[in-house]
């Protein structure tokens, strides 16, 4: 079975002032505080969440 690539995602901007929908997406990714990092699998659903909220995140592959 092939191992999925992972993406390193860091929250770099505050959620204050962000759209409610974007706040919910960020929380769904497991990010709560600024400068916290999560590793998520490189899937189309994850890429979609990143595209919607890219102005709040730093993404490394």
Curated annotation (Swiss-Prot):
GO terms for biological process: translation. The keyword Nucleus does not apply. Keywords: Ribonucleoprotein, Ribosomal protein. One of its GO terms (cellular component) is cytosolic large ribosomal subunit. It holds the Pfam family Ribosomal_L30. InterPro entries: Ribo_uL30_ferredoxin-like_sf, Ribosomal_uL30_bac-type, Ribosomal_uL30_ferredoxin-like. The keyword Transmembrane does not apply. GO terms for molecular function: structural constituent of ribosome. Part of the 50S ribosomal subunit. Belongs to the universal ribosomal protein uL30 family. This is Large ribosomal subunit protein uL30. The lineage of its organism: Bacteria, Pseudomonadati, Pseudomonadota, Betaproteobacteria, Nitrosomonadales.
């Amino acid at each position: 079975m092939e191992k999925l690539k992972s993406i390193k995602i860091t929250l770099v901007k505050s959620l204050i002032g962000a759209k409610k929908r974007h706040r919910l997406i960020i929380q769904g990714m497991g990010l709560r505080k600024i400068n916290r990092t999560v590793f998520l699998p490189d899937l189309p659903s994850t890429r979609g969440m990143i595209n919607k909220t890219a102005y709040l995140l730093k993404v490394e592959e």
